Amino acid sequence: MSQLPTDFASLIKRFQFVSVLDSNPQTKVMSLLGTIDNKDAIITAEKTHFLFDETVRRPSQDGRSTPVLYNCENEYSCINGIQELKEITSNDIYYWGLSVIKQDMESNPTAKLNLIWPATPIHIKKYEQQNFHLVRETPEMYKRIVQPYIEEMCNNGRLKWVNNILYEGAESERVVYKDFSEENKDDGFLILPDMKWDGMNLDSLYLVAIVYRTDIKTIRDLRYSDRQWLINLNNKIRSIVPGCYNYAVHPDELRILVHYQPSYYHFHIHIVNIKHPGLGNSIAAGKAILLEDIIEMLNYLGPEGYMNKTITYAIGENHDLWKRGLEEELTKQLERDGIPKIPKIVNGFK
């Protein structure tokens, strides 16, 4: 029996819809659960941003260069690309309507698609709509609940895809920058586009830097002795990334941050255009921590660094850590804080 093709287009065509996991009208993102060849699959579709024919920089009075977006006369622009119009209503000087804009795979694609296949139950929980809670993770809670979970997530080949990128040349055509030598392996890292970025519009630039060090899974593993390493990383990122995009983005226009809890437990850094509002909670308080703040905080936490700090963050009910102990701990925290329990029946606001 011949093996079915596993290229992206063939897999998408074989996708059998099961349910909608999540739909966000603000970010224009929808996640669908389905199957491909009887194995679970997740497709995430995101509406692409409007594209301009060219982005350039022109010098301004303060010596900086400012972005100039032009060539909206392009046939695929949001003006000349209009093929159909339907007015919704108008009032005085205000008009509302719908339009169909000419699409082209290279110049003006409709959406960006991400596929996870085969998808694990952990993937499905991550993309499924869920309630979130703020929890205070103490050092004791980390060692008792979170650390065993992280160790489990780092075993059984769950990080194989990361090692493929670092050592096996996977996604090599997408790598923006690589700094690695056997002599200074622990200082090495590489930068590549995050799945959240369409790779075309710099306003939504979203990159990820993955380090070669394996002793750091999360910020919990950062000690005071790592402070200079983080400073060097931060400075290298701010020096390198602008040049990779012809200086259309400046060093001080990069939001450089770390997630806790991260989506995978190999230390990595998010690099986002400051114009980008983020998708979901990717740059929100309770998830994102600026690298500059991490570096500064290490000045005050002592030799053990973040291992001795209580960290407050948002956790979804679908996350395995919620049922492994964080839900119970949060209930205890609310009781200790004197926060009254929510009534079982709430009739509405008075």
Swiss-Prot record:
Q: Where is this motif: Histidine triad motif?
A: 266-270
GO CC, alphabetical: cytoplasm; m7G(5')pppN diphosphatase complex; mitochondrion; nucleus; P-body; perinuclear region of cytoplasm
Q: Which UniProt keywords apply?
A: Acetylation, Cytoplasm, Hydrolase, Phosphoprotein
List the catalysed reactions.
a 5'-end (N(7)-methyl 5'-triphosphoguanosine)-ribonucleoside in mRNA + H2O = N(7)-methyl-GMP + a 5'-end diphospho-ribonucleoside in mRNA + 2 H(+)
Location comes to: Cytoplasm; Cytoplasm, Perinuclear region; Cytoplasm, P-body
* SUPFAM superfamilies in alphabetical order: HIT-like, mRNA decapping enzyme DcpS N-terminal domain
User: Which sites bind substrate?
Assistant: E171, K196, H259, Y260, Q261, P262, S263, Y264, Y265, H266, F267, H268, I269, H270
Q: What is its EC number?
A: 3.6.1.59
What happens upon changing H268N?
Loss of function
Q: Where are the Phosphoserine residues found in this chain?
A: S60
Residue intervals passing through the bilayer: none
**Triggers of expression:** By nutrient, osmotic, oxidative and heat stress. Up-regulated during the diauxic shift.
GO terms (molecular function) for this protein are: 5'-(N(7)-methyl 5'-triphosphoguanosine)-[mRNA] diphosphatase activity; exoribonuclease activator activity; hydrolase activity, acting on acid anhydrides, in phosphorus-containing anhydrides; identical protein binding; protein heterodimerization activity; protein homodimerization activity; RNA 7-methylguanosine cap binding
Phosphothreonine: residues bearing it: T66, T120
InterPro entries documented for this protein: DcpS/DCS2, Histidine_triad_CS, HIT-like_sf, Scavenger_mRNA_decap_enz_N
Main subcellular location: cytoplasm
| PROSITE patterns from the UniProt entry | HIT_1
| Family designation | Belongs to the HIT family.
Q: What is known of its domains?
A: The C-terminal histidine triad (HIT) motif and the N-terminal domain are required for the decapping activity.
Instruction: Write the protein's name.
Output: m7GpppX diphosphatase
User: What's the source species for this entry?
Assistant: Saccharomyces cerevisiae (strain ATCC 204508 / S288c)
